Amino acid sequence: MTSRKTGWSLLGAGGCAVLVLLAGGSLLAAGADHLGTPAAAGAFPVNIRVDASRSAGDLRPIWRFFGADEPNYATMKSGRKLIGELGALRTQAVYFRAHNLLCSGDGRPALKWGSTNAFTEDTQGRPVYDWTILDGIFDTYRAQGVRPYVEIGFMPKALSIRPEPYQHRWTPAAKYEEIYTGWAYPPKDYAKWAELVYQWARHCVEKYGAAEVERWYWETWNEANIPYWQGTPEEFRKLHDFAVAAVRRALPTARVGGPDSAGSGGQWMRDFLDHCLRGTNYATGGRGTPLDFVSFHAKGAPTFVAGHVRMGIANELRTADEGFRIVASYPELKHTPVIIGECDPEGCAACQGPQLAYRNGTMYSSYTAATFARLPELAERDGVNLEGALTWAFEFEDQPYFAGFRSLATNGIDKPVLNVFRLFS
């Protein structure tokens, strides 16, 4: 047994990074005097005891998942660089999830916005498919050894029951609710929705091969239990059934699941799982909907108190535990993989504020190390098969350096949090 007094951060020597994993969040309170700068008022030493002779087993590689609101950033200068760095963590084993993959537009990104113009209609109302921008995004992933975690959404303008207004102009100073525009509504024609998804999935199979695409994840929408979905729960389940049936029509061995709910989903999640396991499928008329994985989101809740940020790790772990317990309550899902499809210190990567000041420094990295070390323990205790925890952070192209967004890099400069994933790898 060894004992060491330390005030080191994750950016210190490699051994200290290991201490963060073993000791968790206790390093957050350490001072900064080792850097030659004064320790914060009220700082205190932290003693960490490590038994190097005892092995607790391997840490499951749940960290291999990342994502962002803005899919088009992946094909831009700094985005390509960062995708390459993610792929290098563990080639062919890292996955990327993005919102807005089916949104209508010219492909120019903005905060919390992206588009591919994959679906339009001609003057006769006939579908026109264009995979050019989508191919560019997925080609970038594959060239760097990253695979898609395909989020089927959002609604193309030509299919939305309420297409106007469509593209939002959200800024961090605006109300979050301003993002919910025409893309968030149900389709005016579920058959056309299904055919769009089928044609997209078939195109992916033809372009990348069935053996490759069956290793991807496919799920419908994002957080349909909050206003990201402007329809009813029943309409979402219908949307999901038609999408899953379409993917499986293109590739019967495709890995499909969901629903990537906000939080554990509570009763909304239970209703979804009941439908998938025992309900009548809206698309096929048969019993149930294929469910190869179950996904939900878990977020922390940082606050700004007395001049410093107080991280809310308990909120994230509590939400994860709630989600695990919901899945565990279904015996049929005992061995079904679970993915926390967004697993972060808080809920808005593009938002700014004093409570989010942790993002540029080592508090973000320490928090991530502590959280990802504990999630497998919770999953094991609750009796579920945790396969992944997805970090919803990427980069923001053409923004000021260290602008306060939740990201892994800023204009090509890696942030400390990226070193956590290098350590995990």
Walk through the language-model features, giving the residues of each.
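Extracytoplasmic, non-cytosolic globular domains
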Residues: F236-V247, E316-A328, D344-G347, L356-E380
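Non-catalytic accessory regions flanking glycosidase/transglycosidase catalytic cores in CAZymes
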Residues: G12, G24-Y217, P233-S264, G285, ...
